[in-house]
Amino acid sequence: MALKSYKPTTPGQRGLVLIDRSELWKGRPVKSLTEGLTKSGGRNNTGRITSRRRGGGAKRLYRIVDFKRNKFDVAATVERIEYDPNRTAFIALIKYEDGEQAYILAPQRLAVGDKVVASAKADIKPGNAMPFSGMPIGTIVHNIEMKPGKGGQIARAAGTYAQFVGRDGGYAQIRLSSGELRMVRQECMATVGAVSNPDNSNQNYGKAGRMRHKGIRPSVRGVAMNPIDHPHGGGEGRTSGGRTPVTPWGKDTKGTRTRNKNKASQKLIIRSRHAKKKGR
């Protein structure tokens, strides 16, 4: 999909760059593959804000996407490519030979009428899913499982992908787009290709109202607040904050590592995504 640039006929149109979605399905989603979605407004079960700057936005239906791809050796045909408001990637409606329908993440270069299959060893074509044990080294993949049978968790956002770079014992080595090199079990499933909509990051929404439609509220700088609200707040006139940048709770906010070093999966990371910054 290409990008659409608009002429500055109004202030909201100036600089506006959106994704051209003219080739996507224009109807409603399959009713049996959707369910209701209640907005939380960034609040948890106690009603307190745990994720700031969220609220409002257009109503959405949740599309049930098959991340597991565990219907083996049954070919499916791509019926249509659809927009999904709940993710940055597009989704594809597929129909299996036995009549069952499902939504999957649409990879790049997947077209209406294409055949896809999940198998222990399938052709290297966009949309086909298989475990790493049946995949040639060098394959570009997305929707990668971290635990066999759990469903894909890695490389699901628009334009993302990972590369299968090697095998070691019972593990497959994959290089993520962040630069991280990590291992997953060879029994884990992955789908061939890179995720659709790679131009998503090049959009410019042009006005605050469009972000409100998406459910994103304004971000207020700490230095614009009062001292009761933020460590950078207060002062006479405009100030610089007077200390290293911190969160509203006083923790360093720029570049501080927050990952728990005692995570069980830590030993599966061969090369950190931060390694290139260290010059390694």
Swiss-Prot record:
Residues 256-266 have a biased composition (Basic residues). GO terms for cellular component: large ribosomal subunit. Part of the 50S ribosomal subunit. Forms a bridge to the 30S subunit in the 70S ribosome. Gene3D superfamilies: 2.30.30.30, Nucleic acid-binding proteins, Ribosomal protein L2, domain 3. This is Large ribosomal subunit protein uL2. Belongs to the universal ribosomal protein uL2 family. Keywords: Ribonucleoprotein, Ribosomal protein, RNA-binding, rRNA-binding. GO terms for biological process: cytoplasmic translation. Pfam families: Ribosomal_L2, Ribosomal_L2_C. HAMAP family: Ribosomal_uL2_B.
